[in-house]
Structure formats: C-alpha cells, structure tokens
Amino acid sequence: MWLIAVAIAAAEMQAPALPQWMAGCWESRSGETWTEECWSKPRGGMMIGYGRSGTGGLLDSWEVMQIELAETDDPAIDPITFYGAPGGLNRTAFSWVRESEPGITFVNAGHDYPQRIRYWREGRDLIVEVSLSDGSKARRWRYSPKGN
C-alpha cells in the first residue's frame, strides 16, 4: 500500500513536459476530403504546428499552432500553453489542465468554441477532440501517420 502511495505522489509531482509523442505529420482522409496536422519535435521549450483541411486539391481552412513550456516555478504562470490561430488570425491561448485521462488537455472557458482541446494517442493514431469546457458539442478527428 505504501508503494502505491509513493508512486501516486511521484506521478503528481512530475514536471509538465511538452507532448513529444505528437511530433510528426498526421492525416485523416474520407474520399476526397482530407485534414492534416503536423507538429515539430520539442525544441527550446516549444512545439510549432499547423493544420489544414481541404477537398481534392483545394484548401478549405488552415491554422497555425504552438505549444509552449514555461520555465518557471511561479504557480500564477501556466506551465504549458497551447496557442491556436485559425487562418493565422486571432491567436488564442489555452491553458494546460492536469487530467487523469491519457494525453494532454488545454482549456480556455472564455473562448467561444472550442473551449477544450484534447490530444491523445491510440496505438499509432493521434486523436484530437475539441469541445466546450464541459465536454459538450464535441468534434473528434482520428489521424494516422501521414504517408501510411
């Protein structure tokens, strides 16, 4: 029993880390419709990403993203922040929240939609879910490694 308590305490005390398991290019296809998301490997406390969607050879939408690790012990500063800018506009910050679910979750309850962004892996696939902060109005994408 004591070992379980020690293991739980150690897990809770682990420092936040950038989600290196997201690095790479990911793609989802359904007929002519496609969506892709690419993330750099962590470097210098940051991951840089982009997403784009389209049909055939036409681009429908795009977004630039960033995940930043703050090098601070100040509890007033979010240790990890996700930034998204659909179409390169209105860059919005989402704060990392510690959850028991696998993956990484970011929340900004003051944003219209999405308010919650969650990434996790299932086998080789990268799963992304966006929703309101209570989990309602969820949309989900399942990406496979691009080129496979």
Which residues does each PLM region occupy?
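Sec-dependent N-terminal signal peptides
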Residues: 2-10
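Edge beta-strand at a domain terminus
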Residues: 91, 101, 120-127, 131-148
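Central antiparallel beta-sheet cores of small beta-barrel/beta-sandwich binding domains
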Residues: 23, 28-110
